[in-house]
Amino acid sequence: MVPAVNPPTTSNHVAVIGAGAAGLVAARELRREGHSVVVFERGNHIGGVWAYTPNVEPDPLSIDPTRPVIHSSLYSSLRTIIPQECMGFTDFPFSTRLENGSRDPRRHPGHSEVLAYLRDFVREFKIEEMIRFETEVVRVEQAGENPKKWRVKSRNFGDISDEIYDAVVVCNGHYTEPRHALIPGIDTWPGKQIHSHNYRVPEQVKDQVVVVIGSSVSGVDISRDIANVTKEVHISSRSTKPETYEKLPGYDNLWLHSNIETVREDGSVVFKNGKTVYADTIMHCTGYKYYFPFLDTKGEVTVEDNRVGPLYKHVFPPALSPGLSFIGLPWQVIPFPMFELQSKWVAAVLAGRVSLPSQEEMEDTKMFYLKLEASCIPKRYTHLMAELDSQFVYNNWLADQCDYPRIEKWREQMFYKVFKRIQSQASTYKDDWDDDHLIAEAYEDFVKFPSNYPSSLIEREYTS
């Protein structure tokens, strides 16, 4: 059911935490709805996880709570999993080519191109004027004297600010605080361990035997990245059958195994398939935790086994809505358009243009959790949208709430295509495709937005 869309009635003072892609589009949408916005960014630049740095944390596993935190988890060779046409916000196409050809022309561009796109976005919509750089949010809580207000404490080079806001939108990302595999015997295993958060270049493991834990797209991508400089790479996957043992095509030194059974003091790693290797390094490509160390909700919002909840539609905690919201929690999605639609919804709700259900109705989210449990789906997969159509059903629901056009069919079909290519041609999918007709449809749409994609380039690209 689509709610009634009303004229905006309220202008709020809103704090946005984080100047990555989610925070940037949230700031734009909030201001479009007439809100006053302050974006808090602890770094000195925009981009969040897309701002590459060669620096790594001193603790290679990123376990030490006192460590200096490096926000980005990018490695040097990383290219986008999703084609550039899909990546962009719906009204600001992802342009990777200037007239002089000075930018990355690949359909799956490198991470620096994504950061360049976000900088273009900031420039086009004058977002930088809303950002407080080098300002870390250290505490967010309801203002005691007025629970409908929010107290935000922030730190800038030792100076503490204490301010009151009408609403807080949390956009701090979830690719900074690593998750780790639990490995029997690891306390006495003599080799090195590293989380992929601290992986940058293959030379870090040159001439070594490496065991990579995790067979997700990023785990396999990193394994291929290091295979040319290592002696051997062994991928451990918990999603394969116990007897799994196979050499991956295109490499003489890259194997896929089932899960690790145990590791031993002599440096050996024993897999459930019975194979044993002597490894120098174990690399954890095991994902990340949702982490909000600044947020105090008196237990209304918790993170339990990587479930942030309870949240209505992954965004609003029923007991604290609409003053507190989260953008960007779902994963295995096309992120930027989803961030945009979530932000439109939050901005419209805060403006009074769109209404939320009652708290009781929103608490039906608990039934959703019970259904997951009944289906034996672990809590850590609450925000996973791995089923091919689930994210588009969700995106279209968000669009309907705001009376905004649904996600384009070409974008949806393009995502399906790339997903199939990943499964059938994992080593070549970024440079070999069969959906030129969808690219043409995308460029036809891009003509509507000439500010970021000159029409001369559009015509040349989809007709060449």
Curated annotation (Swiss-Prot):
Its EC number is 1.8.-.-. It comes from the Eukaryota. GO terms for molecular function: flavin adenine dinucleotide binding; guanylate cyclase activity; N,N-dimethylaniline monooxygenase activity; NADP binding; nitric oxide binding; oxygen binding. This is Flavin-containing monooxygenase FMO GS-OX-like 7. Belongs to the FMO family. NADP(+) binds at G214, S215, S216, V217, S218, G219. Gene3D superfamilies: FAD/NAD(P)-binding domain. FAD binds at G18, A19, G20, A21, A22, G23. Catalyzes the conversion of methylthioalkyl glucosinolates of any chain length into methylsulfinylalkyl glucosinolates. The keyword DNA damage does not apply. Its cofactor is FAD. GO terms for biological process: stomatal closure. Keywords: FAD, Flavoprotein, Monooxygenase, NADP, Oxidoreductase. It is an enzyme of class 1 (oxidoreductase). InterPro entries: FAD/NAD-bd_sf (IPR036188), Flavin_mOase (IPR000960), Flavin_mOase-like (IPR020946), FMO-like (IPR050346).
